[in-house]
Amino acid sequence: MIIHPNFDPVAIHLGPLAVRWYGLMYLVGFIFAIVVGRLRLKLPHVAAQGWSAKDIDDMMFYGVLGVVLGGRLGYVLFYKAGYYFSHPLDIFRVWEGGMSFHGGFLGVTLAMALFAWQRKRHWLEVTDFVAPMVPTGLAAGRLGNFINGELWGRVTSPDAPWAMLFPGASRDDAAWLAAHQDIAAKWNLNEVFLSHQMLPRHPSQLYEIALEGIALFFVLWFFSRKPRPMGAISALFLIGYGAARFTVEFAREPDDFLGLLTFGLSMGQWLSLPMIVAGVLMMIWAYRRGGVAKQA
């Protein structure tokens, strides 16, 4: 078993100002997105559409607003609506954590629609350009989760080579042990807990980095290197992210204030299913429609 390094959540101290790893990873994610966007400008069919470095900079401005506002509001509405309706001022305490990818996705979608309207471009032209830029940012965000030792995975066998002990999960581990003595006996977890005061869990943040970040990036990057029907790249992102998130959720610990919902699925899985369905329908529509994005 591997013990989580238990990093200091503060990366840099600047006098009274503390720069946290999670916020730093958001910055890294946006930088990666800009780099990927500029690399895409070198593709002939992308350059022919009239995209420029200034467009990328403007997109990132809209994207930051969409991620922060949408991610926070999504977390408030999808995960802890009851709490925040009772404590509305806590909605603004973003530094304490609490962001939702699906909310951020909706926020960015609306932000890109506004960008497209201002630039007189079709909305799907914009999302097709942006889609391959997103996974590297997702990977950076999940790395921030791992550094913080949060959003850990479900309990697993101590014999699994990837099993990890998360100090922050010790209280949850004790509650899990009391409720699952049948599995604990099968995996000798009582002995593990007596020795470490923790239980082995899946490092699900790393799974998400691998699937939602690295794998999805390469799939989108190679798919988008050739001209595709308008909407196809966006559709592949919806399918790829939705499928990756749905899969990883089987190893990720459900939110304690929600648990598992209908059919034993988590909130993340229920929010991912519409993405997959929408992506499949959009892909069919894109190829039936035919053609590629217009040139400038």
Swiss-Prot record:
Pathway: Protein modification; lipoprotein biosynthesis (diacylglyceryl transfer). This is Phosphatidylglycerol--prolipoprotein diacylglyceryl transferase. The keyword Metal-binding does not apply. Its EC number is 2.5.1.145. It is found in: Cell inner membrane. It comes from the Bacteria. The chain crosses the membrane at residues 17-37, 59-79, 97-117, 230-250, 265-285. Catalyzes the transfer of the diacylglyceryl group from phosphatidylglycerol to the sulfhydryl group of the N-terminal cysteine of a prolipoprotein, the first step in the formation of mature lipoproteins. It holds the Pfam family LGT. Keywords: Cell inner membrane, Cell membrane, Membrane, Transferase, Transmembrane, Transmembrane helix. A 1,2-diacyl-sn-glycero-3-phospho-(1'-sn-glycerol) binds at residue 142. Disulfide bonds: none annotated.
